[in-house]
Amino acid sequence: MSYSLKGLLKRPVHLFVKPPAVEGEYPARGELYYVKGSNGSGKSTVPSYLAENDPQAYVVTYNGKIMLTVCPSYNIICIGKYDKSKSKGVDSLKDTEQMLFALSIADQPEYLKYDVLFEGIIPSTLLSSWIPRLTRPPRELVVLFMDTPLETCVSRVKSRNGGADFNESLVVEKWERVHDHSQRHKGLFPTVPAGMMKSNGLTIEQAVFAFLNRDFGSID
């Protein structure tokens, strides 16, 4: 499918009742964050919070499809949509081509003043193919691995399913794969900065605060 930047539209996230103005300033760092984690790890928690709490938030659409969620109060662009639907982030986009198109929108001059947050279960489980795709100067690529324990991930997925049976082995396999990626990252990609995105033991507000202050843990 052929995509064109001419077909883009903007729409406010908060049409009727807006959240209060965001207190404080959160300058961009010139970075693109590639967040990796299994189901239930909390990958979408921070971007969902930003979209819900930024009164200036808006989405960029193409043919009715949400490509970007822009949070000006936090100087962050989140790839994909962050609403009440089940699929969030790049998982809400159709395929790799659409993900790359969304990234190309974020590369446009009007958006370069923002940092970018890219997360989804499919890119999380791939070891290397997204590293070159997300190396997009002038932004610096930073890979972030969720620090959420396996037991917590499994518990969250079970809760989402209302306690119904699910294939726990799929969550375990994805968690182990992402954990393996974190252990191998420095050896495979020594020039690509990486860290741990803090979630374990934190409230949602604490996790968001840690991210906004770029307080990342070490992968060592």
From Swiss-Prot:
Gene3D superfamilies in the cross-refs: P-loop containing nucleotide triphosphate hydrolases
UniProt cross-references to Pfam families, sorted A to Z: HMUDK_HMUD1 (PF18748)
Residues annotated as signal peptide: none
Keywords annotated in UniProt: Host-virus interaction, Inhibition of host innate immune response by virus, Restriction-modification system evasion by virus, Viral immunoevasion
InterPro entries: HMUDK/HMUD1, P-loop_NTPase
Superkingdom, taxonomy of origin: Viruses
Gene Ontology process terms (BP): symbiont-mediated evasion of host restriction-modification system; symbiont-mediated suppression of host innate immune response
Record carries keyword Disulfide bond: no
Reactions catalysed, as given in the entry: 5-hydroxymethyl-dUMP in DNA + ATP = 5-phosphomethyl-dUMP in DNA + ADP + H(+)
Function: Phosphorylates 5-hydroxymethyluracil (5hmdU) into 5-phosphomethyl-2'-deoxyuridine (5- PmdU) on DNA as a step in the pathway leading to thymidine hypermodifications in the viral genome. The phosphate is added internally to the DNA polymer. As a final result of the pathway of hypermodification, 5-aminoethoxy-2'-deoxymethyluridine (5-NeOmdU) substitutes for about 40% of the thymidines in the viral DNA. These modifications probably prevent degradation of viral genome by the host restriction-modification antiviral defense system.
Family in the record: Belongs to the thymidylate kinase family. 5-hmdU DNA kinase subfamily.
Protein name: 5-hmdU DNA kinase 1
Phylogenetic classification of the source organism: Viruses, Duplodnaviria, Heunggongvirae, Uroviricota, Caudoviricetes
